[in-house]
Amino acid sequence: MTGAQLRIGTFTPSLLIDLARSTGRLDRAGLEVTEIPVPSSPAQFRSLETGELDVVMTSPDNVLAYRFLSANPLGHTLPVDILAGIDRGLGLSLCLAPSVTGLADVRDRVVGVDVPESGFAFVAFSLLERAGLGPDDYKVESLGSTPRRAAALTAGTCAATVLNAGNELRARASGCRVVSTVADIGPYLGTVMAALSADDPTAAGPRNRLAEAVIDTARDIVTGRLRQEVLEAAGRLLGLEDPEARAHLGCLLDRTHGLITDGHVDEASINTLIDLRRRHSPSPDLAVVASAWPTMLTAAALGTGPRT
């Protein structure tokens, strides 16, 4: 019998989706999931709005921006919900190009971002600020998704960018340097699963089942049940050699940077996102965000959903 079909937009190929499929969780949930790579966060949310995508893996800052702030790249808000928290950044790090010997050399050079008004960009700006570099000390250039920025960094198109999800490991193996991580800023939520609000159970049901399947897969990884499967998928999907694949597995298991095993979105990490926006993109609308953000969470993200 054909399962419910879902199209999910991702920046970097998702090990969780891949392993949920290979372990049979998607089949048991009655789901056929197609993963579609997206070039940037504006493109991702534009496709979500038009119905080209049903679900996205994205930064929670994107959800805050597109739900509450009309001054987002689309120019209007969307009724988007967080279905589950996925990870805490997966090694989100400030990285330097092979030719850049230190942070001082970033001065007057290009810092690559997805788009300037985005959560990962704010992390880059904050980590550079901690190193003594302000916004007038470098040029900001939109280079798109994390894999695209990793390629640009390795090629020397930009001097610095933030990378994660195995991209930082592949870049380091190509001669790039990791100089700081998002943990230097505070508790962080790197990826969530999100979708447009859906009151119709025929639409909401498959999305919620996908969130549950991914959460359960994350739990299996963290408890050590899928070690070899993770290493194989890291090589096949992310292009990581064995040492980098093992480092990525360690990152998935790490409590500071790794997977979230219950889907819960915590207040401290959301506050970090809001504080970063206040510093790097101040807006009076952020006062509303600070009080209204729980309204974007579904039961699993609130930590109240049913568990199997």
Please report, for each region that a protein language model flagged, where it lies by residue.
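Conserved C-terminal helix/tail region of periplasmic/extracytoplasmic solute-binding proteins
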Residues: 274-308
